[in-house]
Amino acid sequence: MAALGSPLRTWRGLLRELRYLNAATGRPYRDTAAYRYLVKAFRAHRVTSEKLCRAQHELHFQAATYLCLLRSIREHVALHQEFHGKGERSVEESAGLVGLKLPQQPGGKGWEP
């Protein structure tokens, strides 16, 4: 994992992923146990002065790791839905998956298939 960034950015990313998870259920993300736990943990490890706090850095690292997990799961599900085998595909669909287009069949007067 690269540099952690700011705790606020990690916090916002976690909230965004919670919103994505709860969009399917229709429930507000603030009603979940995960949200309440994150709020409680971030408030408990908030530092008001510039002292070095190991617990805050550990919390930030764990939160960033959890954010990476949630984001990876969401992207995996999206890729799985897009590319999962749905039986036999047509030639046009297979070409479209890799970004190609089939040439158009010539038509008009005198053309016989």
Curated annotation (Swiss-Prot):
Task: Give compartment(s).
Answer: Mitochondrion
Q: Which Pfam families match?
A: Complex1_LYR_2
Q: Which GO terms describe its cellular component?
A: mitochondrion
Q: Name one GO biological process term.
A: mitochondrial proton-transporting ATP synthase complex assembly
**Chain ranges passing through the membrane:** none
Where in this protein does the record put region Disordered? 93-113
| Keywords from the UniProt entry | Mitochondrion
Q: Which InterPro entries match?
A: FMC1_homologue
Q: What does this protein do?
A: Plays a role in the assembly/stability of the mitochondrial membrane ATP synthase (F(1)F(0) ATP synthase or Complex V).
Q: Subunit info?
A: Interacts with ATPAF2.
Q: Which family does it belong to?
A: Belongs to the FMC1 family.
Q: What name has this protein been given in UniProt? A: Protein FMC1 homolog
